[in-house]
Amino acid sequence: MTQTSNSQYLVILYYQYAPIKDPQTFRDQHFKYCESIGLLGRIIVAQEGINGTLSGPEEQIHKYMDQLKQDPRFCNTVFKMETVEAHVFPRLSIKVKPELVNLSLQENVDLTKDKGAYLAPQEFLQALQEKDTLILDARNDYEYDLGHFRNAVNPNIRHFRDLPNWVKQNTHLLKDKKIVTYCTGGVRCEKFSTFLKKEGFDDVYQLEGGIISYGKHPETQGALWDGQMYVFDQRIAVPVNQKEHVIVGKDYFDGTPCERYINCSNPQCNKQILCHEYNEHKYLGACSDKCSNHPQNRYLKKHNNPNS
């Protein structure tokens, strides 16, 4: 389909826990529709619901949202929306998975039962300033390293599925505490806060709408957030705090303030590191000597053959 060059583009993030009896058929129909209206992005479909982020021209994004909400299961879906200059995804990917977000529990938590109470952005800001409240980041380590709420606890996990083990190893930190957890858009906290309640922690809360909603709220304006927010698209980093910008990221090599992520130039490693441009050139885009000397080093291929 054709688009006018002056179309405003939008990127949306959303999720909805709702039963999907035949995820594969749902996925196939969903892919066909998204492709037909020119949307790009990533969507996960599971028996427990849908979790997605898409980009496209404003008209097509609104068309998609209206179409999804016509399904009674998704009529209450909340979409977080931002304006962008163009597509922020290279392709459209819709996959069927066992869970929307993978906690790898032997028995999946029941999201229709007890879960962490929602805190609106204003309430979350108040919780951030409470002395005895534990603010727990439910995201991965590389997300935390780029930006996080001030004084938030960092579980230092590589994958969301590592959180349950971290909780079991750190019950002494959580016991008898008011626990407030947060993530990018809220989908991880829905499941994680339910897990915490199931584990016997009673005073559990979650940031409603995630970091994205908090940063855009007119009263909070992202206050007490330091750094930038990691996003899973071509932007990589987006601002949250509208009042001040405190850089917390540190260059992988020299520890200087940095908010620029690259992937290690060894395709078999691909580790994400915060790295200034001068250090990328110095270390051939790699995270180690071993990776810099790898025969498939992408940095060397690119600079030895600029047309490749």
Curated annotation (Swiss-Prot):
Its EC number is 1.14.-.-. SMART domains: RHOD (SM00450). GO terms for molecular function: oxidoreductase activity, acting on paired donors, with incorporation or reduction of molecular oxygen. PROSITE patterns: RHODANESE_3. The active site is at 183 (cysteine persulfide intermediate). The keyword tRNA processing applies. Residues 129-223 form the Rhodanese domain. One of its GO terms (biological process) is tRNA modification. InterPro entries: Rhodanese-like_dom, Rhodanese-like_dom_sf, Rhodanese_C, TrhO, TRHO_N. Keywords: Oxidoreductase, tRNA processing. It is an enzyme of class 1 (oxidoreductase). Coiled coil: none annotated. It comes from the Bacteria. The keyword Oxidoreductase applies. It catalyses: uridine(34) in tRNA + AH2 + O2 = 5-hydroxyuridine(34) in tRNA + A + H2O. HAMAP family: TrhO. Catalyzes oxygen-dependent 5-hydroxyuridine (ho5U) modification at position 34 in tRNAs. Belongs to the TrhO family. NCBIfam families: PRK00142.1-3 (NF001135). This is tRNA uridine(34) hydroxylase.
